[in-house]
């Protein structure tokens, strides 16, 4: 990640958990990121990276089963996050809840450890 120290960065807005995590990853790599672009829209992150205007830390899920269009670099330490759903016990068997959980499981399967 140190090679990205001299590049412009795109990150989520200040105050978000993902921004805090990304800044900490940069600091652990020994640099303060030069954040020139800020947006919560991860598709905008991808477009800025594709155009060569910025580098970014993006979750694997953004590629949605399609091949990446930019060079990917694996981060040290195998960082990951856990996604979960919760419902009231009485609502857990509702068809809409079951459908959403099944769709999430299918969508996340390609990037799950």
Where are these regions (language model features)?
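Beta-alpha-beta core module
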Residues: 3, 43-92
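Short aromatic/hydrophobic contact patches that present stacked aromatics
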Residues: 8-10, 36, 84-86
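Primarily hydrophobic membrane-targeting regions of prokaryotic envelope proteins
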Residues: 26, 37, 46-47, 103
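Short beta-strand-to-loop elements that line the ligand-binding cleft
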Residues: 11-12, 32-41
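Residue-level recognition of oxygen-bearing side chains
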Residues: 17, 41-44
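Secondary-structure junction motif
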Residues: 1, 7-29, 93-101, 108-113
